[in-house]
Amino acid sequence: RALPEVRVYMAKGAHSCVAKALEIMGHGSDCVRQIPVNDMSQMDMTALTDAIAEDRENGLAPLAIIGTAGSVGVGAYDDFNALADLAAQESIWMHVDAAFGYWSRLADSPYRELSDGIGRADSIALDTHKWPGVQYDCGACLISDRDLHRSTFSSRPAYLESAASGLAGGDLWFCDYG
């Protein structure tokens, strides 16, 4: 059975890594729909809502909304509460590219408010090398649904045996999360 053609939504000017990731996943970069931005360089919520409705009418499957915390070009933060509300209403995955702007969650006011609602995302990517001087290859992807994350990556082939203790001990193996 063929999978439906998917759509991923992100603001114009969002990081190019999204298109690259979709290429790696086999969806191709053509599934990206760039949404116009408002005067604060945030994804325009009316345009996003209209794009999702239009794509559904055309038989496409909205897969994800990619919010941005600190866009590379202008440092913009999307309205994460509005994105999360729409994602929940439409049953669409909400991811936040917080590679550059995750730090604001740790900051004092007024910078902390830039990332209000970011915790409602289904997943968040961050790169610590962009702020605290950590090595370039240090990054993380946080997934809100532990069970979904585990079931996606968990694999117990016959040659991997459980043990009472040690690295293979217990129910949770390091490899069960990717």
State each model region's role.
Residues 1-67, 74-78, 82, 108-113:
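PLP-dependent aminotransferase-class I/II
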Residues 18-20, 31, 75, 103-104, ...:
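Short helix/loop capping segments that flank catalytic or ligand/cofactor-binding pockets
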Residues 62-74, 87, 92, 164, ...:
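Soluble FAD-dependent oxygen oxidases
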Residues 71, 116-178:
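Active-site C-terminal subdomain of aminotransferase-like
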Residues 76-108:
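Catalytic PLP-binding core of fold-type I/II PLP enzymes
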Residues 14, 71, 98-102, 130:
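Active-site-proximal loop/turn and secondary-structure-junction residues that shape catalytic pockets
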Residues 100-101, 106-123:
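Acidic/histidine-rich catalytic neighborhood
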